[in-house]
């Protein structure tokens, strides 16, 4: 699997940015300098911290990139039931509002990294945002289905991902299974 750290620096390194004010949790304003890049992770949340938006933010931080998120779903695990997964999608309007807020607060987003979306409706909302905001760089790390989702939904999700997001991606970082699937092998 191609990892995000190897993909992001060259992509973000070619974007010219300007300083912007943004609010902090203390109600003060902080200033991002003109060289700090901003990346938006559109992804699911996963409690272990080993995947999803949490890991994207850690990766951005390690690369010196300021990260913000739009959560698409919440995935939980049941340690008492063979670590079974529970998938809960975030309301599409909330996803839209999160993306809109990230852009409005920072005035720009230099790159978008898309992870687990989980439903065709969510994919549609993200595709609309990509069209509306014309983000300079789009990294797609497709997660077609997780344990706990209905297997029948995987085909609709896969088709929506191929149709609406794959053509808009500058970089795709799938695992081998998804690479074979995307290549129709």
Describe every region a protein language model picked out.
Residues 2, 7, 15-17:
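Acidic, Ala/Val/Gly-enriched low-complexity intrinsically disordered segments
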Residues 32-41, 53, 57-151:
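Conserved N-terminal subdomain of the carbohydrate kinase-like
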Residues 43-49:
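Short, glycine-rich nucleotide/cofactor-binding loops
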Residues 154-161:
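Charged helix-capping and loop-helix junction motifs
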Residues 165-166:
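A conserved, positively charged/aromatic
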Residues 170:
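Receiver (REC) domain switch/active-site residues of two-component response regulators
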Residues 178-183:
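Conserved small/polar residues in nucleotide/adenosyl-binding loops
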């Amino acid at each position: 699997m191609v990892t995000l750290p190897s993909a992001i620096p060259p992509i973000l390194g070619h974007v010219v940015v300007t300083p912007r004010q943004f609010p902090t949790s203390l109600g003060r304003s902080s200033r991002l300098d003109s060289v700090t890049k901003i990346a938006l992770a559109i992804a699911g949340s996963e409690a272990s911290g080993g995947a999803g938006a949490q890991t994207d933010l850690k990766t951005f931080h390690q690369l010196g990139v300021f990260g913000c998120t739009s959560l698409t779903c919440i995935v939980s695990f049941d340690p008492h039931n063979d670590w079974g997964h529970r998938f809960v999608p975030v309301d599409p309007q909330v996803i839209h509002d999160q993306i809109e807020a990230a852009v409005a607060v920072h005035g720009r987003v230099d790159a978008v990294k898309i992870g687990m979306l989980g439903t065709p409706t969510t994919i549609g909302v993200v595709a609309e945002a990509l069209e509306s905001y014309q983000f300079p760089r789009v990294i797609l790390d497709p997660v077609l289905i997780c344990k706990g989702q209905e297997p029948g939904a995987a085909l609709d999700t896969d088709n929506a991902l191929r149709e609406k997001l794959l053509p808009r991606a500058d970089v795709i970082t799938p695992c081998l299974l998804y690479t074979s699937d995307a290549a129709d092998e």
